[in-house]
């Protein structure tokens, strides 16, 4: 045993062990072991879009608890880390940080700046992840913008293209006018906004007045029809008639459709191309004409005597309303609160434009994807409903085209050869990764092709995060098929609940389309970290917690302890009280270990080397046997909890045992025996020291997944030169059990509790001598009586069985 330092310095020790673990490759994956013994994790690659906050630490450490446990029970851990460093989120970071705009620069120059920024940001991420002791294998690190990742992402696209699951179409899509790009349904969020319901006067072709309510009067020039519900008796007489739009005097058909809400507005609706999803449905089902008046920049393009050209949407709305009022065509306005679909990143209200884009088929696979969600093991189970609700709500195929620069390009060109103009040309697998702006399709010259200028949605690459580590996509598209087959599908996907609709859904979709299989067997979903007042953390509120400052104040083990005290999937508020409890636990572990170690030199070196099961007969004392039985039960409960991803229950049970059973009771009760100053009971002394030796060792192992630094330091001082975190170092007591009557030891604890309360009530020292304890309701064995005398400072104890319930009469010295 090493010399025990006087104090535990978490700053020095955490840095020391992080360096040693890295140097000794404690967490390295062994590629030579069989597939059966591997535990494979699809670690979330954090988006390089800003500073990591405490919420990231919260979820990443929860994954690490499970990974460390799996390693300790003997699994060969494949635990990579990646950085999602391409796409719109990263571009927005670069534009903000460098005060530039991508569209004002040369494409290559902007990409170069992006690469420099992500390199610096990833160094910060990497350092923080090491500081909080994520036990990842850093040799498995990847970046989603790297040549290898681009190759795998382009392989995914080509595989789906060959399978007929990808198509290119000129159709309505969601468009962000601020970032100037198409978006997918998963990239939007609903926001409540104050608006006006405007009641506008239309006329029939015959001159009859019709009132139509709308929140988008600026779309009047794009009106292509008027609809009513077929069961609405107010408007059945309008069948086969036409309406004349106000101001623009365009003739449009009046049609019946069951999607009209009779109780909304006047029950008459104008269909414009396009205001919402319903407009698209009507446009398609009724074969209506297309009138596009909104540009990609969010301005109006509509030459007319009513001059709207070049106005923003908001400006056009105001102008239209003013003119309608002037001409007495606006009969009423009502202030309403409406749900507006906005871009998740820019926050801008979305428009629906008709643009040629690439899509992955999604709608046709909804039923199959719902079945997949049932095949997956969800932790916690209630999170499954979120994905099912999302799948059921889908109404668009996945648009994967983005009109940006820093992303994975489509491996596509369009032919300009005479006779095949517009023909889609795609890269050969041997060419990947390709940049169609610089590279050429086989057999074509630069003059014969136009490159696809778009890049893929960042989720199109993130959705193959497992494959970025396995180096394969499918039977036909793989860089290393042997590696892919060994590592795919994976065991675990850890992630936060807010990206179930994106990362979880898209990864399941891609895996289903590529190989008709789930990408992983289990998914553990973490909640959000909230501010102390339970509000969402945000920079505008000034309540965002910076992990680096907390690490300086408390250290990684304490932060990890706080994270472990939150149930999986729950949104949890940051708590200073829990942080203080964690700090208290670190100190108590140190002091308890230091206390019990005083006597470890009395144990033989042989007894220290072997498992407790091999020398169980040397635990001779009844109270020692009782705590070992309790310890064995704890190990089983904690193991079962961690196997079911219930890390919070595992640490709760372990901490409760440590404080209540081991420190507060066992160490106090057995202390006199351990010292055995008069050499009265050498067998009882050896039994208690051996018990403390194994209980402390077991507790360190149970705490190790949560608090890796303090447990490593104590384990190295007390037990072994090998790391506590090595593969296969979990506790396994098998069927170890001492056949004892628990009523005796537990009766002792009941009596002790009564005595402690008595002394506290009368402000007596815990060591205050007692002349006599008169105990009824139980009779203890001789060795338990000696322990009870020692811990209560009682001169004598008398027992009788006149009561069923334990009662104690305490007599003090006069």
From Swiss-Prot:
Its main location: cytoplasm. Signal peptide: none annotated. A motif ('HIGH' region) lies at residues 46-56. The keyword Methyltransferase does not apply. GO terms for molecular function: aminoacyl-tRNA deacylase activity; ATP binding; valine-tRNA ligase activity. The keyword Protein biosynthesis applies. SUPFAM superfamilies: Anticodon-binding domain of a subclass of class I aminoacyl-tRNA synthetases, Nucleotidylyl transferase, ValRS/IleRS/LeuRS editing domain. ATP binds at residue 539. Keywords: Aminoacyl-tRNA synthetase, ATP-binding, Cytoplasm, Ligase, Nucleotide-binding, Protein biosynthesis. GO terms for biological process: valyl-tRNA aminoacylation. GO terms for cellular component: cytosol. It catalyses: tRNA(Val) + L-valine + ATP = L-valyl-tRNA(Val) + AMP + diphosphate. A motif ('KMSKS' region) lies at residues 536-540. It is found in: Cytoplasm. Its EC number is 6.1.1.9. ValRS has two distinct active sites: one for aminoacylation and one for editing. The misactivated threonine is translocated from the active site to the editing site. Monomer. PANTHER family: VALINE--TRNA LIGASE, CHLOROPLASTIC_MITOCHONDRIAL 2 (PTHR11946:SF93), VALYL-TRNA SYNTHETASES (PTHR11946). Belongs to the class-I aminoacyl-tRNA synthetase family. ValS type 2 subfamily. Catalyzes the attachment of valine to tRNA(Val). As ValRS can inadvertently accommodate and process structurally similar amino acids such as threonine, to avoid such errors, it has a 'posttransfer' editing activity that hydrolyzes mischarged Thr-tRNA(Val) in a tRNA-dependent manner. This is Valine--tRNA ligase. It comes from Rickettsia typhi (strain ATCC VR-144 / Wilmington). The gene is valS.
């Amino acid at each position: 045993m090493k010399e025990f330092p006087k104090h535990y310095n978490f700053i020095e020790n955490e840095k020391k062990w992080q360096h040693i673990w890295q140097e000794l490759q404690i967490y390295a994956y062994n590629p030579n072991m069989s597939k059966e013994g591997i535990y494979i994790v699809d670690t979330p690659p954090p988006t390089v879009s800003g500073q990591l906050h405490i919420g990231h630490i919260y979820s990443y450490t929860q994954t690490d608890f499970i990974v460390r446990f799996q390693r300790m029970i003997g699994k060969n851990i494949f635990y990579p880390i990646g950085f999602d460093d391409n796409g719109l989120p990263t571009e927005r970071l670069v534009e903000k940080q460098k005060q530039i705009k991508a569209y004002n620069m040369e494409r290559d120059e902007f990409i170069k700046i992006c690469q420099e920024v992500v390199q610096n940001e990833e160094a910060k991420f990497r350092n923080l992840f090491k500081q909080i002791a994520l036990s990842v294998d850093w040799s498995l690190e990847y970046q989603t913008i790297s040549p290898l990742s681009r190759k795998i992402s382009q392989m995914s696209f080509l595989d789906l293209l060959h399978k007929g699951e990808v198509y290119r179409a000129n159709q309505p899509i969601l468009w962000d006018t601020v970032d100037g790009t198409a978006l997918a349904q998963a990239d939007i969020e609903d926001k409540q906004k104050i608006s006006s319901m405007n009641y506008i006067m239309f006329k029939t072709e015959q001159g009859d007045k019709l009132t139509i309510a709308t929140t988008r009067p600026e779309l009047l020039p794009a009106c292509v029809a008027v609809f009513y519900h077929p069961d609405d008796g107010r408007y059945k007489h309008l069948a086969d008639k036409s309406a004349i739009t106000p101001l623009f005097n365009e003739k449009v058909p009046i049609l019946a459709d069951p999607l009209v809400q009779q109780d909304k507005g006047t029950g008459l609706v104008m269909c414009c191309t396009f205001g919402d999803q319903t407009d698209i449905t009507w446009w398609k089902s009724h074969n209506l004409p297309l009138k596009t008046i909104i540009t990609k920049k969010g301005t109006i393009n509509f030459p007319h005597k009513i001059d709207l050209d070049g106005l923003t949407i908001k400006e056009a709305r105001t102008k239209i309303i003013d003119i309608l009022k002037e001409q007495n065509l606006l009969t009423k306005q009502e202030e309403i609160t409406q749900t507006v679909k906005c871009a998740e990143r820019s926050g801008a209200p979305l428009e629906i434009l008709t643009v040629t884009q690439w899509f992955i088929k999604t709608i046709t696979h909804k039923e199959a994807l719902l079945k997949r969600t049932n095949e997956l093991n969800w932790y916690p189970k209630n999170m499954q409903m979120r994905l099912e609700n999302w799948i059921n709500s889908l109404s668009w195929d996945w648009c994967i085209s983005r009109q940006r620069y820093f992303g994975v390009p489509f491996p596509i060109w369009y032919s300009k050869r005479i006779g095949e103009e517009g023909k889609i040309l795609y890269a050969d697998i041997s060419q990947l990764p390709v940049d169609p702006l610089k590279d050429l399709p086989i057999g074509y010259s630069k003059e014969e092709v136009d490159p696809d200028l778009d890049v893929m949605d960042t989720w199109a690459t993130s959705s193959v995060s497992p494959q970025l580590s396995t180096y394969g996509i499918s039977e036909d598209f793989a860089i290393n098929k042997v590696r892919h087959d060994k590592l795919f599908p994976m065991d675990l996907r850890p992630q936060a609940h807010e990206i179930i609709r994106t990362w979880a859904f898209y990864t399941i979709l891609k895996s289903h389309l590529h190989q008709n299989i789930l990408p992983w067997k289990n998914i553990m979903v973490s909640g959000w970290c909230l501010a102390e007042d339970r509000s969402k953390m945000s920079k505008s509120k000034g309540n965002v917690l910076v992990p680096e400052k907390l690490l300086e104040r408390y250290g990684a083990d304490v932060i990890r302890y706080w994270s472990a005290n939150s149930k999986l999937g729950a949104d949890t508020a940051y708590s200073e009280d829990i942080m203080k409890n964690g700090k208290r636990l670190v100190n108590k572990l140190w002091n308890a270990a230091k206390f019990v170690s005083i006597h470890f030199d009395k144990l033989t070196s042989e007894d220290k080397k072997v498992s407790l099961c091999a020398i169980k007969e040397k635990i001779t004392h009844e109270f020692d046997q009782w705590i070992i039985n309790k310890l064995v039960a704890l190990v089983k409960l904690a193991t079962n909890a961690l196997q079911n991803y219930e890390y919070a229950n595992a640490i709760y049970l372990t901490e409760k045992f440590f404080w209540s059973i081991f420190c507060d009771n066992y160490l106090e009760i057995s202390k006199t025996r351990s010292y055995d100053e008069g050499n009265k009971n050498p067998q009882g002394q050896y039994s208690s020291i051996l018990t403390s030796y194994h209980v402390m060792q077991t507790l360190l192992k149970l705490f190790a997944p949560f608090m890796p630094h303090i447990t490593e330091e104590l384990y190295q001082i007390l037990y072994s030169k090998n790391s506590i975190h090595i593969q296969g170092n979990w506790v396994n007591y098998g069927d170890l059990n001492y056949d004892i009557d628990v009523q005796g030891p537990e009766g002792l604890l009941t009596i002790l509790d009564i005595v402690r309360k008595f002394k506290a009530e009368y402000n007596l020292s815990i060591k205050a001598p007692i002349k006599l304890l008169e105990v009824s309701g139980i009779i203890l064995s001789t060795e338990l009586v000696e322990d009870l005398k020692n811990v209560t400072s009682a001169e004598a104890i008398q027992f009788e069985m006149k009561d069923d319930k334990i009662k104690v009469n305490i007599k003090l010295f006069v």
